[in-house]
Amino acid sequence: MVDYVTDIVVIGAGPIGIFTVFQSGMLSMQCCVIDSLNEIGGQCVALYPEKPIYDIPAYPIITAKELINNLVEQSKPFDPQYLLGQVAEKIEEYIDYLLVKTNYGTVIQCKAIIIAAGSGAFGPNRLPVDNIIDFENKSVFYSVKQISDFYDKSVMIAGGGDSAADWAVELSKVTKQLYMVHRRKNFRCSPNTSLKLDDLFQRGKINLVVPYQIKQLCGKDGKLDYVVVKNITTSEELTLQVDYLLPFFGTSANLGPILNWGITISGYQIVIDPATCRTNRNRIYAVGDVSTYPGKIKLILTGFSESAMACHDIYHIVYPNSPLNFQYSTSKGIPKV
């Protein structure tokens, strides 16, 4: 039994997936969007909704959440069907269509599939401390939903990559006390962010705790009181008063069932034709960070371009007897789907 019939199934409700809804709608094609998360936005919303983004055309600065909100608003005229909290598990190929089956047993009939899954289904790498679960989502968080939550608080950031460095810079503006714990003195972040960190360290806006790692969390009923850190060289221990802990050790991601679909994979990315974004399988496309080809640049705007190319190629599948006469959106307006 088929639950939904649509033109394109989009796998992934991140920025590229949402923009695909708009691009397909501009070509009078409908979309059904599947995402394993329970909200629209992918990693942008789940991990860093307030993180500033600087390389979106016409926006000198925009937060990840604002970007998602704008993309959702832009795609609204095309009334997409979102299937959230579901995973696309199986694909069945027929002469004129595909069937997509989710882990909930939902069946969608479509003309084509666009995989816009980013890094795939993901979750944060947990801090290796025995009682970490007792504090998660209470005083230990793997993402920042609202910067205002940390106003005038004592906060510890653990990690040495881009996320840890970027959030240290941002949260130093609002916290009462900010600790940055890392195993090494060097941070793996952009040169510009590194300069900002050095300045904040010098001015005492951030307390640098290196080379240390977190040993123990102390508190009651999910509320942190203290964090014990241990020097990895001398074994010296420090007990620091902390209200919130933000571990940024990256995420673990995988393509899940997509790996079983007979699609050519290289380094956990889907190999595509850069001119059309087709995979090696009939009617299946991939766009955004999940896709790869020689010279690929992993930027959001690259994904937007790939989405447009894939939709234009799929148009000929959905409307085989209707030639595509290209028009600029200024002349065309918003079509009715």
UniProtKB/Swiss-Prot annotation:
InterPro entries, alphabetized: FAD/NAD-bd_sf, FAD/NAD-binding_dom, Fd--NADP_Rdtase_type_2, Ferredoxin-NADP_redctase_2
Alphabetic keyword roster: FAD, Flavoprotein, NADP, Oxidoreductase
Any GO molecular function: NADP binding
Reactions this protein catalyses: 2 reduced [2Fe-2S]-[ferredoxin] + NADP(+) + H(+) = 2 oxidized [2Fe-2S]-[ferredoxin] + NADPH
Binding note for cofactor: Binds 1 FAD per subunit.
Summary of subunit composition and partner proteins: Homodimer.
Family designation: Belongs to the ferredoxin--NADP reductase type 2 family.
Protein known as: Ferredoxin--NADP reductase
Biological classification of the source: Bacteria, Pseudomonadati, Pseudomonadota, Alphaproteobacteria, Rickettsiales
